[in-house]
């Protein structure tokens, strides 16, 4: 079993952490994030370290111990540095563009796909075949990237579609005569 919860979360300078009852608020240069704690974990602030401890030794309390610590670590990293996911588009005629508060995708369908951009997430298209999604919430940035990728996932024969920048597509050989 992983013991992620044993290690403290270090708070960098420029980030403030406030614990009020069952809610932890983390503020930084990129904004503010809040986390409502479960009733079986206890969070304490000691200088610039956040410690998470289970209130009892039940299996559920130990599970939430590491999960809560990971969420707090992601919040601290998100408000100080932020998270970025890069997507690549491969295929003839496949392109993307940011128009106002929406992302316009041309992916070989008979219609263009409009994806609304949430307020706390920024999207950039330096090239028509590259999308950069960034924000302070790791879960939200990853979810948006997965939803955009799902519009046209990469196919194994020609590699056409939307893929993560670091993803490698397992290519298949075509049928033989």
UniProtKB/Swiss-Prot annotation:
GO annotations of cellular component type: cytosolic large ribosomal subunit
Pfam families reported for this sequence: Ribosomal_L6
Domain of life from the UniProt record: Bacteria
UniProt GO molecular function: rRNA binding; structural constituent of ribosome
Presence of keyword rRNA-binding: yes
Database matches in InterPro entries: Ribosomal_uL6-like, Ribosomal_uL6-like_a/b-dom_sf, Ribosomal_uL6_a/b-dom, Ribosomal_uL6_bac-type, Ribosomal_uL6_CS
Keyword terms, alphabetized: Ribonucleoprotein, Ribosomal protein, RNA-binding, rRNA-binding
HAMAP family for this protein: Ribosomal_uL6_B
Protein family (similarity comment): Belongs to the universal ribosomal protein uL6 family.
NCBIfam families the UniProt entry points to: L6_bact
Complexes and interactors: Part of the 50S ribosomal subunit.
Protein name stated in the entry: Large ribosomal subunit protein uL6
């Amino acid at each position: 079993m992983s013991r992620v919860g044993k290690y403290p979360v270090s708070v960098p300078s420029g980030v403030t952490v406030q614990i009020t009852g069952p809610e932890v608020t983390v503020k930084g240069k990129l904004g503010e994030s809040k986390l409502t704690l479960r009733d079986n974990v206890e969070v304490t602030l000691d200088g610039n370290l956040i410690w998470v401890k289970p209130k009892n030794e039940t299996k559920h309390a130990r599970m939430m111990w590491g999960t809560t610590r990971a969420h707090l670590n992601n919040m601290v990293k998100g408000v100080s540095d932020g998270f970025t996911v890069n997507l690549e588009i491969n295929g003839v005629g496949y392109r993307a563009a940011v128009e106002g508060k929406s992302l316009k995708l041309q992916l070989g369908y008979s219609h263009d796909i409009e994806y609304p951009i949430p307020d706390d997430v920024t999207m950039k298209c330096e090239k028509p075949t590259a999308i950069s999604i960034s924000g302070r919430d790791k879960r939200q940035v990853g979810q948006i990237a997965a939803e955009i990728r799902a519009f046209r996932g990469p196919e194994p024969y020609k590699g056409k579609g939307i893929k993560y920048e670091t993803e490698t597509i397992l290519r298949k050989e075509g049928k033989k005569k």
